[in-house]
Amino acid sequence: MSKEQILLRINQLKEQLNLWSKQYYVDDNPSVDDTEYDLALKELISLENLYPEFITSDSPSQKVGGTVSEKFLKITHKTPMLSLGNVFNFDEFLEFNTQVSKVSNNLNNEYVAELKIDGLSISLVYENGVLVSAATRGNGVIGEDVTTNVRTIKSIPLKISKKERVEVRGEIYLSKAEFEKINQKRLLNNEDLFINPRNAAAGTLRQLDSKIVASRNLDAFLYYYISDDSPNLNQYESILKLNQLGFKTNKETMLCKNLDQIKAYIDKYTNLKNDLDYQIDGIVFKINDKNLQNSLGFTSKIPKWAIAYKFPAEIKQTKLLDIFATVGRTGKITYNAKLEPVFLMGATISAATLNNAEYIKSKDLRINSIVKIKKAGDVIPEVIEAIKDETFYNLEVFQPILYCPNCHSLLEKNENEVDQFCINSSCSMKILRSLQHFSSREAMNIVSLGDRSLEILFNLEIIQNISDIYKLEEYKDQILAIENFGLKSYLNLIDSINMSKNNSLEKVLFGLGIRHIGSKTAKILARKYQNIDNLMKASYDELIQINSIGESLALSIIDWFKIEDNLKLINELKSFNINFNYLGAKINSDSIIANKTFVITGTLTRPREEFKTLIENNAGKISGSISKQTDYLLAGNNVGSKLEKAKKLGVIIIDEQQFFDLLKSEKG
């Protein structure tokens, strides 16, 4: 065949395969068997391998994965991806509808009812009919670029017929059947099991190797259509438009015309939720009328025209087989329940946290008793009470342990605290948990050094403390000798470790595990002191002057830097060129808004995070509510009750332009 004929055949195969994919994954109505599809795909891949110049991003061959990404870039959402408010029963929904009715003047508002898929939100952007980007929700303003991985999801089209820019939003999920397959495979490979389908889907989408993503058969339901040429589509029209363009939407979606239909929909899926092949944790109700949506507007975090109805927690009975304790990175002892397996909220539950000894005593939980367990949504299962039948009082009363379950050191408990602690600095489990915390995503984000890998390296005594992480190149041969740890894994590990050296101060500060310092406090301290040396010199009196730093936290910081081993660790990390400087924008303490408190409300023309950052960079403070201490209310469009309260309290009210003018002005 000539090149022209090859190109023609490739285009024919692409068109045919895309049609078959839509019929199978979106319409649920396949017209050919798997063998015919596979043969056509094999022919396409063969031709594209011979003529790689003809490979395009919309080719079905690109759904098999293969690109390994070094890291995920960031994408700013053109329209913020907001979260939803919640209601937990029908009476609360009626209250929400009453608020809507104050604007619509109609109690029987039309709502689109959508099952709330327990997955992760995604934003897809198409330009000239081709998928150009896919981003996670992230913080609502900025998400992670997962385009390469999303291309492998068979129910998401790489090409659509519309040429204008289109943004489509939906939920990526893993079916229950696929979840079971993945966990069975992980069990055979002696890998940690995923807790639930949502965690598995999230973990899969963040894989650096898209071949792994392709192998796990993620799926997607799309529900939101944004396009400049169709700004006034009603919500249900938006769903129909998505169907027309070849997107997979949930067939259970319904246009409810009155409250009776809404109640019937809730009752139906409260009973059927566990029979679906995907997990749901509620129902989303959205006002259908686009004009009414616009009139209702938004708060700072949520749309006022949509609400999530969350299913009530499920409660079941099972047997408490055992109570066992674990030790965390700070030495805190956590008690856990081993349960006779029971199916609850779409998952098999065999364990639950019992928090601490005081919690167990307060509920009088006893081994071999029958207990009630509760689970709501993605929340960890909770043991709520013991069934005190005639056999209960013959069971042994629970007694707290006295010694660490790992190193067997005597535990300590302060009078004013409910928790017990292992204070042995050499406790191996404390050390391992500290290492896992240091390398975690929220801290140093050493992507290739997961909990499992760290445990293996720790048990082999290759890593025994934080500084050992930065010496791994000395152990190349030992690491390569580990089963399933090839050269590629080793190189990825070293790259991740080297990248972590460039983190900003707040990441390493959080990673060090100083008691009471969370990620938010770490950032406050990093912004204030700019580098680790300044923080080490800070006095107690100086620390407690900082907003949100209390006495116990200030003492914890002072005490941590008094310990010789901790100072030695800082110096060792410096010798490995770990950055200990704050890399964020420097605070302008001389700004006119320094120490002024702002509240932000309404819809703004720029992302809310941008205004928060500007305020913080100019030494201002952010509050979520109006009070006598509020200096300014920054008000956008569609403001709510905060405006009236600000007027009553005499708070200065400014718009966006006045805010920027204020920043430019000088202190008088």
UniProtKB/Swiss-Prot annotation:
<protein>
    <recommendedName>
        <fullName>DNA ligase</fullName>
        <ecNumber>6.5.1.2</ecNumber>
    </recommendedName>
</protein>
<feature type="binding site">
    <location>
        <position position="286"/>
    </location>
    <ligand>
        <name>NAD(+)</name>
    </ligand>
</feature>
<keyword id="KW-0227">DNA damage</keyword>
<keyword id="KW-0235">DNA replication</keyword>
<feature type="binding site">
    <location>
        <position position="404"/>
    </location>
    <ligand>
        <name>Zn(2+)</name>
    </ligand>
</feature>
<feature type="binding site">
    <location>
        <position position="407"/>
    </location>
    <ligand>
        <name>Zn(2+)</name>
    </ligand>
</feature>
<dbReference type="InterPro" id="IPR001679">
    <property type="entry name" value="DNA_ligase"/>
</dbReference>
<dbReference type="InterPro" id="IPR004149">
    <property type="entry name" value="Znf_DNAligase_C4"/>
</dbReference>
<dbReference type="InterPro" id="IPR036420">
    <property type="entry name" value="BRCT_dom_sf"/>
</dbReference>
<feature type="domain" description="BRCT">
    <location>
        <begin position="588"/>
        <end position="668"/>
    </location>
</feature>
<feature type="binding site">
    <location>
        <position position="427"/>
    </location>
    <ligand>
        <name>Zn(2+)</name>
    </ligand>
</feature>
<keyword id="KW-0862">Zinc</keyword>
<feature type="binding site">
    <location>
        <position position="310"/>
    </location>
    <ligand>
        <name>NAD(+)</name>
    </ligand>
</feature>
<feature type="binding site">
    <location>
        <begin position="83"/>
        <end position="84"/>
    </location>
    <ligand>
        <name>NAD(+)</name>
    </ligand>
</feature>
<dbReference type="GO" id="GO:0046872">
    <property type="term" value="F:metal ion binding"/>
</dbReference>
<dbReference type="Pfam" id="PF01653">
    <property type="entry name" value="DNA_ligase_aden"/>
</dbReference>
<feature type="binding site">
    <location>
        <position position="171"/>
    </location>
    <ligand>
        <name>NAD(+)</name>
    </ligand>
</feature>
<dbReference type="InterPro" id="IPR013840">
    <property type="entry name" value="DNAligase_N"/>
</dbReference>
<keyword id="KW-0520">NAD</keyword>
<dbReference type="InterPro" id="IPR004150">
    <property type="entry name" value="NAD_DNA_ligase_OB"/>
</dbReference>
<dbReference type="Pfam" id="PF12826">
    <property type="entry name" value="HHH_2"/>
</dbReference>
<dbReference type="InterPro" id="IPR013839">
    <property type="entry name" value="DNAligase_adenylation"/>
</dbReference>
<keyword id="KW-0436">Ligase</keyword>
<dbReference type="InterPro" id="IPR001357">
    <property type="entry name" value="BRCT_dom"/>
</dbReference>
<keyword id="KW-0464">Manganese</keyword>
<dbReference type="Pfam" id="PF03120">
    <property type="entry name" value="DNA_ligase_OB"/>
</dbReference>
<dbReference type="InterPro" id="IPR012340">
    <property type="entry name" value="NA-bd_OB-fold"/>
</dbReference>
<feature type="active site" description="N6-AMP-lysine intermediate">
    <location>
        <position position="116"/>
    </location>
</feature>
<dbReference type="Pfam" id="PF00533">
    <property type="entry name" value="BRCT"/>
</dbReference>
<dbReference type="InterPro" id="IPR018239">
    <property type="entry name" value="DNA_ligase_AS"/>
</dbReference>
<dbReference type="InterPro" id="IPR010994">
    <property type="entry name" value="RuvA_2-like"/>
</dbReference>
<comment type="function">
    <text>DNA ligase that catalyzes the formation of phosphodiester linkages between 5'-phosphoryl and 3'-hydroxyl groups in double-stranded DNA using NAD as a coenzyme and as the energy source for the reaction. It is essential for DNA replication and repair of damaged DNA.</text>
</comment>
<dbReference type="GO" id="GO:0006281">
    <property type="term" value="P:DNA repair"/>
</dbReference>
<comment type="similarity">
    <text>Belongs to the NAD-dependent DNA ligase family. LigA subfamily.</text>
</comment>
<feature type="binding site">
    <location>
        <position position="422"/>
    </location>
    <ligand>
        <name>Zn(2+)</name>
    </ligand>
</feature>
<dbReference type="GO" id="GO:0006260">
    <property type="term" value="P:DNA replication"/>
</dbReference>
<dbReference type="GO" id="GO:0003911">
    <property type="term" value="F:DNA ligase (NAD+) activity"/>
</dbReference>
<keyword id="KW-0460">Magnesium</keyword>
<feature type="binding site">
    <location>
        <position position="114"/>
    </location>
    <ligand>
        <name>NAD(+)</name>
    </ligand>
</feature>
<dbReference type="GO" id="GO:0005829">
    <property type="term" value="C:cytosol"/>
</dbReference>
<keyword id="KW-0479">Metal-binding</keyword>
<dbReference type="InterPro" id="IPR041663">
    <property type="entry name" value="DisA/LigA_HHH"/>
</dbReference>
